Amino acid sequence: MRPFEDSPISRDGKVLILAYDHGLEHGPVDFEAVPATKDPEAVWDVATHDAVSAMAAQKGIAEAYYPSYSDDVNLLAKLNGTSNLWMGEPDSAVNWTVDYAADVGADAVGFTLYGGSNSEVEMAEEFRDAQEAARDHDLPVVMWSYPRGQGLKNDKNPDTIAYAARQALELGADIAKVKYPGSTDAMSHAVDMAGPTNVVMSGGSKTSDRDFLESVKGAIDAGASGLAVGRNVWQREHPAAFLDGLEAVVYEEASVDEALGRI
């Protein structure tokens, strides 16, 4: 396995992943704010911004659109995912193999694990297979480490987020994608628990420019390696301008006010 810093999805040891798996996970509701984003080409175009180190997409979106963008965008193949129509205990279907993702041209793979769900054991075993196959292809592995389940009362509790980051390390992920636990100190705890596994902040629902940049700044100051963001970029009227601001915070460690000045 090559060092993470040498991976195509890394820029100077940092990552900014543009996520676009929402059509499966959330459905059409996520495209209502900016109707143009229902067209995948509109978001692939956003992903050509220099700040974006990879775009996360499901199988069908990658098959249909990545060939036209392979020279300008690094592909993070999101291997599993389930619709919001599913009403059972949190789980996620494996929709394509690492081997097939590599054939499509993936530069990395992503996999959701719902720690605490009744499906955790099965999902961990599926992650094992994906992680080991990714090693054969020299592809970095990003774990969407999201604790969920009937017994979990607060999925943003600092100890829960730290556990999620640690779980990613223990199971062999190169990057742990976790929710921001609300403060730099709490995020630092998660980063510490992850050891050599890089931690990135999950973007979540759209917030104001300042609020989101402050969360990203808090994560970077805590030692996070970047973020994976979808709605907080492509639900904005001017996504490229907002990426200018994120680029300043993630790669240049600029202040929030400096970043706002670039938007």
UniProtKB/Swiss-Prot annotation:
**An example molecular function term from Gene Ontology annotations:** fructose-bisphosphate aldolase activity
Enumerate the InterPro entries for this protein.
Aldolase_TIM (IPR013785), DeoC/FbaB/LacD_aldolase (IPR002915), DeoC/FbaB_aldolase (IPR050456), FbaB-like (IPR041720)
- According to its UniProt record, which reaction does this protein catalyse? beta-D-fructose 1,6-bisphosphate = D-glyceraldehyde 3-phosphate + dihydroxyacetone phosphate
Instruction: Classify the source by domain of life.
Output: Archaea
Catalytic residues (positions): K177
Keywords on this record? Glycolysis, Lyase, Schiff base
Q: Which SMART domains match?
A: DeoC
Q: What would be one Pfam family of this protein?
A: DeoC
What SUPFAM superfamilies does the annotation carry? Aldolase
Query: What is a biological process (GO) this protein takes part in?
Result: aromatic amino acid family biosynthetic process
Look up the EC number in the record and give it: 4.1.2.13
Function per UniProt: Has aldolase activity with fructose 1,6-bisphosphate. May play a role in the biosynthesis of aromatic amino acids (AroAA).
The family classification in the record reads: Belongs to the DeoC/FbaB aldolase family.
| Protein's name according to its UniProt entry | Fructose-bisphosphate aldolase class 1
Print the organism lineage: Archaea, Methanobacteriati, Methanobacteriota, Stenosarchaea group, Halobacteria
